[in-house]
From Swiss-Prot:
DNA-binding regulatory protein implicated in early development. Involved in neuronal cell fate decision. May act as an octamer-dependent activator of transcription. Could also play an early role in specific ectodermal cells, and a subsequent role in the embryonic nervous system. InterPro entries: HD, Homeobox_CS, Homeodomain-like_sf, Lambda_DNA-bd_dom_sf, POU, POU_dom, POU_domain_TF. GO terms for molecular function: DNA binding; DNA-binding transcription activator activity, RNA polymerase II-specific; DNA-binding transcription factor activity, RNA polymerase II-specific; RNA polymerase II cis-regulatory region sequence-specific DNA binding. This is POU domain protein 2, isoform B. It comes from Drosophila melanogaster. Residues 602-617, 647-665 have a biased composition (Low complexity).
Length: 893
C-alpha cells in the first residue's frame, strides 16, 4: 500500500532538488500541523499519563489507520513515555527509515522529541508491525474516531488502499520528471511536453493546500482515483502500461512477505488531513462486510482492459478473443465448403445422367488396364461389365442395362452414386494410405532417376522374381499424390452408399483366371530353371553395356573421363552378376531336388565377414565341418574363382562326400575368369581361414604343443621364426587378411608333418627333435626345457645390436643367424634381445607401429644417430640381395 507521507523535508530522498524557500515553508507547516494534531488527539482520547495508556493509544491509532501493531508486553513499559506521543505527525519521520530513508541522515527529524522515539520502540523484538490491506471508506467519517476532532484539509491521500493497476510500492518508482516521463502522473495532461519538470512544483501542487504543505504527488505513492484513471485513458493507449510496473511487481510481493516492519499506509488519524473529494478508490483486497454494498456498486461498472487488468492478463484475454474469432470463422468456412462440395457432387451426378452413355466398340488400345479405356480425348472410361463382384450387398438398378461405361473427368476423384464398383488397386488409380489416388509414373521413364547417371541395366538379384505388374504396383504405391483441395476433401467425405461399404481389394477376374491357370500348370509340371547359354547371355550383356555407356556419355560425360576404364568396370560387374545369377539358379534347383533339413541350431557366423560381402545366404548340409585342405574344388563351388577381393564369398555349400555336377556354363565362365591374374590371398576364403584356424588350434592342443613351441619349430624347420603372440593372433583371427593367407600354408604344412610324425611314433608324445635332427643338433627337448639363466651382453656387442636394430627392428631368421655367427652368440639370445628391444622402443615411442608383421627400417634421425655412424658395410650380404629389411612374415609381438 502507498507508504507514509513524508511531512519533513529532511527524510525525503529527493530533498536535494527542492529549493530553500520550499524547505522553510514545509518545515513551518509541518510544525504547525503537528502541534494542532497533537492537541486534538490528546483532548479526544485519554490522558497518556502511564505507559499502559500510551500503549493502548498507539495500538488504537495504528489499527484505525490500517497498521496492525502487535505488542507482547515484554520490555514495553520501560520504554514508553508521555512525551513520545506528543507529536503524532512525526510518526512518519521517526519510522521513515523503514520506508527506504536513511535514519542517520544529516538532517535530523523535526522536531526531535527524545533520544528514544517511536524508532526505538519499533526496533524492539517484541513488537511486530504488519501490513494489512484495510478498507476505510472516506464517505463514512464515523469509522475513524480520530477524524471527528480534525479540521478538513486539502490532501490527495485519503485511505490506505492502493489503486488496482499500480502494484509496486512508491519508493521503488522513480520520481516524476527525473529521467523519464511517468504516464501515471496527474500532470500528464497538463499540455506541457517537458520531461524534466520541477519536482518542487509537483510536490507543492499535489496537495493543493493554501499552507504550502510539501508532499509527494498522488501517482508517486501509487494511489489513483477513478477520475485520474479516466483522465489517463484519454491520452494513454491500451498497451502502453509503464514497464517498471510489471518489472517490480514480483519484487514488491517478495518484500510484502518478508519485511515484517514495512508500513505501507499512513494513518489518517495521525496525519489529520481528511480527503478533499469523496471519491471511491479501487481495491485489490476482498471486500469486508461493511463495504459490501459499495463494492457491489464498483463491480457493476463495466471493466475495460486499460487500467483494470495487468499487462499480461490483458494480452492473454486479447489472444483468447482472437482465437475465438478465428475458430468461428473457420467453422463457418468448413460448413460452406461442405455445402459447396455437396452442390458440386449433385451437379456432376446430373451431368453424368444427362450425357449419353458411350459404348466402346473396340478394345485394341486397352493397354492391360483392367476396366479402364482411354478414348481419343484422353478421358478414362471405366467398363462396368468386367468389374469384380461387390463384397457386400449394394443396391442394384431395377432394369437391366447393357455393359456401358462411365466417362470420368481427367482430374476428378470424387465418387458417384450410380452403380460403380469400388476402385481396385489397378494401374490407373492406386489407393494410398491417406485415402487419395494417384497415377503411377511413366512406364518408359520408370528406370530413370534424378541423378545425372542412370541406374545400371543389370537388375539386382532381389528383383529377379518380380513381375511387371508387381513393379507397377510398387511404383503406384510409392508415388507422390498432388495436394489439391479436392483430394483433401475427399479424404474426409464419402458418399452415402460407399460410406458403410466393405472395401473390395480382391484382384480382378482376369488376373484371378491367369493365376489359377499358372497354379494348375505349376502343379502338373514343376518349373524348370531358366537355362541360358553363356554365349547368348554374354552377347545380351555386351549390348546392354554398349547402350548403357552411350547413355552415360550423353547424360554425364564427366562421370567417366576414361571410357576404357568404364568398360572394364562394367564388364567386371556384368560377369559378377552373371555368375551370381547362375549360382542362384543352381541353388534353387538344388533346393527343389533335395530340400534343406531343419536346423536345430543356427548357422555359425564368421566374425570376419560383413553382411555386404555375401548377398546370397549360405547353407550347409550338416553341422560338421572338415578342414579346408580336404575339400575339393567342386565342394567350394565357383565363387572363389569368380569373386574379386571386394566380394570374396557369394555362397559356400560344403557337401560331405558328394557334389552336384556343375553345368558347363559355370565352368566356361570360371575358366574365362581364371585367366585373369590373381594373388594367393584372392583365392583364399575368409570362412576357409576361420575353419583352418579353429582346426589348427584343436589339433595343436591335442598333440600337446604350446603356441611358443609351434613358433620355434617353424623357425627351425622353415627358417621363419614366429613368436607365441603371432600364433595366438592367428588362432584368434586378429591378423590382417594378407598375413593370415601367408601364414596358413606354413602352419598347414607343420600340422601335416606333426600328424605324420605322431602316426610314425605310434601315437606317443611328439618330440620336436625327430623333426629337427637334420637341421640342428639341439640336445634338449622343447617340451622339457627349463628357464635359462639371464644372459649378460657386453657393451660392444650391445652397440652392434643397437645399430642392427636401427636398420631393421624385425630381422629374419637368416639375419639373426648371421648376427649370431659374427658375434659368437646364441641365436636364441639375439632373437630374445630383439623382442625385448622392440618392447622397450614401444614404451619409449608409442606412436611407432612395431606390431606389424612387416619389418621396416627405423629412421636414424629419430634416435639421434648421425647417418655416418650407421655405416654397416661389413654386414652387407653378398649377391646384391643383402638387406636388413625383414620379410613380410616375421615374428610379431
Amino acid at each position: 500500500m502507498p507508504l507514509l507521507l513524508a511531512t519533513t523535508l529532511a527524510n525525503n530522498s529527493h530533498h536535494q532538488h527542492l529549493s530553500t524557500t520550499a524547505t522553510e515553508t514545509a518545515a513551518a507547516a509541518a510544525t504547525a500541523k503537528a502541534a494542532a494534531t497533537a492537541a486534538a488527539a490528546a483532548t479526544a482520547t485519554m490522558l497518556l499519563t502511564s505507559p499502559t495508556a500510551a500503549t493502548h493509544c498507539l495500538a488504537a491509532a495504528t489499527s484505525a489507520a490500517g497498521v496492525n501493531v502487535q505488542i507482547t508486553g515484554q520490555g514495553v513499559s520501560a520504554t514508553l513515555n508521555d512525551d513520545q506521543l506528543q507529536l503524532p505527525a512525526n510518526y512518519a519521520a521517526n519510522v521513515g527509515h523503514l520506508n527506504g530513508f536513511n535514519p542517520k541522515d544529516n538532517c535530523p527529524p523535526v522536531p526531535p522529541t527524545s533520544e528514544r522515539a517511536f524508532e526505538g520502540l519499533l526496533r524492539l523484538p517484541q513488537i511486530q508491525v504488519k501490513q494489512e490491506f484495510m478498507e476505510s471508506p472516506p464517505e463514512r467519517p464515523s469509522c475513524h474516531p480520530m477524524n471527528h476532532q480534525q479540521a478538513p484539509a486539502n490532501s490527495a491521500l485519503a485511505t490506505s488502499c492502493r489503486g488496482k493497476t499500480i502494484l509496486n510500492p512508491w519508493y521503488l518508482r522513480p520520481a516524476d520528471g527525473i529521467g523519464y516521463h511517468n504516464y501515471n502522473s496527474n500532470n500528464n495532461n497538463s499540455g506541457s511536453g517537458e520531461i524534466n519538470k520541477d519536482v518542487s512544483q509537483q510536490m507543492t501542487s499535489a496537495c493543493g493546500g493554501s499552507d504550502g504543505q510539501t508532499c509527494l504527488p498522488v501517482s508517486y505513492f501509487g494511489m489513483e482515483t477513478l477520475a485520474s484513471v479516466k483522465q489517463r485513458q484519454k491520452s494513454l493507449p491500451d498497451f502502453l502500461i509503464p514497464l517498471h510496473e510489471i518489472m517490480f511487481q514480483q519484487q514488491h510481493h517478495y518484500q510484502q512477505r518478508t519485511m515484517g516492519t514495512l508500513i505501507n499506509s499512513l494513518p489518517p488519524g495521525l496525519v489529520g488531513y481528511p480527503p478533499q473529494k469523496t471519491e471511491t478508490f479501487k481495491s485489490l483486497t476482498p471486500p469486508k462486510a461493511l463495504q459490501h454494498h459499495q463494492n457491489n456498486q464498483n463491480h457493476q461498472i463495466p471493466q475495460n482492459h486499460t487500467g483494470d487488468h495487468s499487462f499480461v492478463r490483458h494480452f492473454h484475454e486479447r489472444d483468447r478473443l482472437i482465437r475465438e474469432h478465428q475458430l468461428k470463422h473457420q467453422q463457418l468456412r468448413d460448413v460452406e465448403e461442405v455445402l459447396q462440395e455437396q452442390e458440386q457432387d449433385e451437379e456432376q451426378e446430373h451431368e453424368t445422367l444427362r450425357k449419353p452413355h458411350v459404348v466402346p466398340s473396340e478394345l485394341e488400345h486397352n493397354h492391360h488396364w483392367h476396366g479402364v479405356v482411354c478414348d481419343a480425348n484422353g478421358h478414362a472410361t471405366r467398363l462396368l461389365h468386367i468389374a469384380p463382384p461387390r463384397a457386400g450387398p449394394t443396391p442394384l438398378p431395377t432394369h437391366q442395362q447393357p455393359p456401358v461405361g462411365e466417362v470420368l473427368p481427367p482430374n476428378s476423384t470424387s465418387f458417384s452414386t450410380i452403380v460403380d464398383p469400388p476402385k481396385e488397386p489397378s494401374i490407373y488409380e492406386q489407393p494410398a494410405p491417406n485415402g487419395r489416388h494417384c497415377r503411377p509414373a511413366n512406364k518408359v521413364m520408370r528406370h530413370m532417376s534424378n541423378s545425372p547417371t542412370p541406374p545400371s541395366p543389370l537388375r539386382s538379384l532381389s528383383d529377379c522374381g518380380k513381375s511387371f505388374e508387381e513393379e507397377e504396383l510398387e511404383l503406384g504405391e510409392n508415388c507422390e499424390m498432388p495436394q489439391n483441395l479436392s483430394s483433401k476433401r475427399q479424404a474426409r467425405e464419402l458418399d452415402s452408399e460407399l460410406e458403410n461399404e466393405v472395401l473390395d481389394l480382391a484382384p480382378p477376374p482376369k488376373r484371378l483366371a491367369e493365376e489359377q491357370e499358372e497354379e494348375k500348370v505349376a502343379s502338373v509340371n514343376p518349373p524348370q530353371p531358366v537355362a541360358f547359354a553363356p554365349e547368348e547371355m554374354h552377347q545380351a550383356l555386351q549390348l546392354q553395356l554398349h547402350s548403357y555407356i552411350e547413355m552415360v556419355r550423353q547424360l554425364a560425360p564427366e562421370a567417366f573421363p576414361n571410357p576404357n576404364l568404364a568398360t572394364q568396370f562394367l564388364l567386371q560387374n556384368s560377369l559378377q552378376a552373371l555368375a551370381q545369377f547362375q549360382a542362384l539358379q543352381q541353388m534353387k534347383q538344388q533346393q527343389r531336388e533335395d530340400p534343406l533339413p531343419s536346423y536345430s541350431t543356427p548357422l555359425a557366423k564368421s566374425p570376419l565377414r560383413s553382411p555386404s560381402l555375401s548377398p546370397v545366404p549360405r547353407h550347409s548340409k550338416s553341422q560338421q565341418r572338415t578342414p579346408p585342405n580336404s575339400m575339393t574344388a567342386n565342394s567350394l563351388g565357383m565363387s572363389s574363382a569368380v569373386m574379386t577381393p571386394n566380394t570374396p564369398s557369394m555362397q559356400q555349400q560344403p557337401q560331405l562326400q558328394q557334389s552336384t555336377p556343375k553345368p558347363t556354363s559355370g565352368l566356361t565362365v570360371a575358366s574365362a575368369m581364371a585367366k585373369l591374374e590373381q594373388s594367393p590371398e584372392e583365392t583364399t576364403d575368409l570362412e576357409e581361414l576361420e575353419q583352418f584356424a579353429k582346426t589348427f588350434k584343436q589339433r595343436r592342443i591335442k598333440l600337446g604343443f604350446t603356441q611358443g613351441d609351434v613358433g620355434l619349430a617353424m623357425g627351425k624347420l622353415y627358417g621363419n621364426d614366429f613368436s607365441q603372440t603371432t600364433i595366438s593372433r592367428f588362432e584368434a583371427l586378429n591378423l590382417s587378411f594378407k598375413n593370415m593367407c601367408k601364414l596358413k600354408p606354413l602352419l598347414q604344412k607343420w600340422l601335416e608333418d606333426a600328424d605324420s610324425t605322431v602316426a610314425k611314433s605310434g601315437g606317443g608324445v611328439f618330440n620336436i627333435n625327430t623333426m629337427t635332427s637334420t637341421l640342428s643338433s639341439t640336445p634338449e627337448s622343447i617340451l622339457g626345457r627349463r628357464r635359462k639363466k639371464r644372459t649378460s651382453i657386453e657393451t660392444t656387442v650391445r652397440t652392434t645390436l643397437e645399430k642392427a636394430f636401427l636398420m631393421n627392428c624385425k630381422p629374419t631368421s637368416e639375419e639373426i643367424s648371421q648376427l649370431s655367427e659374427r658375434l659368437n652368440m646364441d641365436k636364441e639370445v639375439i632373437r630374445v634381445w630383439f623382442c625385448n628391444r622392440r618392447q622397450k622402443e614401444k614404451r619409449i615411442n608409442p606412436s611407432l607401429d612395431l606390431d606389424s608383421p612387416t619389418g621396416t627400417p627405423l629412421s636414424s634421425h629419430a634416435f639421434g644417430y648421425p647417418p655416418q655412424a650407421l655405416n654397416m658395410s661389413h654386414m652387407q650380404m653378398e649377391g646384391g640381395s643383402g638387406s636388413f629389411c625383414g620379410s613380410s612374415i616375421s615374428s610379431g609381438e
